Curated annotation (Swiss-Prot):
It comes from Rhodopseudomonas palustris (strain BisB18). GO terms for cellular component: plasma membrane. The keyword RNA-binding does not apply. Its main location: membrane. This is UPF0391 membrane protein RPC_3278.
Amino acid sequence: MLGWVITFLVVALIAGILGFGGIAGASIEIAKIIFFIAVVLFLVSAVVGLARGRNRV
């Protein structure tokens, strides 16, 4: 449990530095880009997984 506390402390410190440091706007844009890339990769992998599942029968 102590490991989780340390992990969340580090995440909170990084978020505070980014939020109060003035680069929050750039971080938001990067997060949006990464989010949409992750959604596209998820959809591609889901379609490929479904296509492979049908051919194995």
